[in-house]
Amino acid sequence: MSETKTKYKLGLQLPTDPRWANMAEISLEEILTDHAFCEQKATTSCISLIQKYPKHTRLVNELSPVVTEEWGQFRLVIAEMEKRGMQLGEQRNDEYVVALRKFQKKDGSRKTALIDALLAFALIEARSCERFRLLSLNISDPKLRDFYHMFMVSEAGHYRMFLDLAYHYAENNVFVKNRWQQYLDFEEELMKTLKPRADRMH
């Protein structure tokens, strides 16, 4: 396998419980609400990284269009809800993301903190991609299947971008590969503790 394929393989070590997609379809208004706020938080996270690392030209150039894309996707989810006569609900605490944020290294150099943040974002995008794929394959509504296939493709691209940025700013590839594996191992154990919920994307 080539280095590029190895680098970009999702590598998730525990698949989502297949029952989750059916649960999500039954609670569509709740899952769309959570999805909308996931897009909003992704927008905010990209802006935050740009603010923290304004002199990292490649990061700024690559994340700037993602800010626009993520906010546009928030609006797409809202529009889809309105078409279906649904109301955006309250934002909920994302246990999955909170746990990953706690796993991030906060001490050390700014470069180490940046690499860890990029890897955390890459993992969130990878899991989102996997879940969007489940929805695109299992939801009965063909329009929603297409809707979530589009999001799956988008998240796959964001995952690759975040991981590639981590490699770009790291001092060596071995460090990134080792830390990425630590994230994957941590996420596997985390997934074992989180019960599938119909009102959560993660």
Regions from the language model: what does each represent?
Residues 1-202:
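Non-heme di-metal
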